[in-house]
A protein has these predicted regions:
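Non-globular, low-confidence helical/coil segments that flank catalytic cores
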Residues: 1-136
Length: 136
């Protein structure tokens, strides 16, 4: 069963904020993936879900993408996600990519890895590095 968020939501737990951003797209289910921002004293982490560059730009045009410390790459590092506009706005120092080893889709895509290198991001990948833990 899928549940759709109808509006943005902010949850606060002490000094940690959890922002849930929504957009409305009729292009595909992936474009309606929730975008989640963990905003803490020491580290801001952005997760854009399975959105493509189109969905990422929807968030950008709505003013929902701040600068962050860590970005979880969109759609497992596919070539159509984690676009240059998103990287320029978010300016992440670190990018984590969740992808299975030897997956059928070839994630993460070489184009995405090159974009991340061009932006000077430190990249961690579950297919290569295993479980990723972020501590600050």
């Amino acid at each position: 069963r899928q549940v759709y968020a109808e509006q943005d939501l902010l949850l606060t737990y002490g000094k940690t904020n959890l922002h849930i951003f929504t957009t409305d797209s009729d292009r595909s289910e992936n474009e309606n993936s929730l975008c989640v921002l963990f905003d803490t004293e020491n580290c801001d982490i952005l997760i854009t879900g399975d959105r493509s560059a189109y969905g990422e730009r929807m968030l950008l045009h709505a003013g929902k993408i701040p600068e962050v410390d860590v970005l979880i790459a969109g759609h497992h590092g596919s070539k159509n996600s984690t676009c240059e506009d998103l990287l320029a706005a978010a300016q992440p120092q670190t990018v984590c990519i969740s992808a299975g080893r030897d997956n059928l889709y070839g994630h993460p895509a070489a184009e995405t890895l090159q974009r991340l290198e061009n932006f000077g991001c430190t990249v961690y990948r579950t297919d290569r590095d295993g479980t990723i833990t972020i501590r600050r």
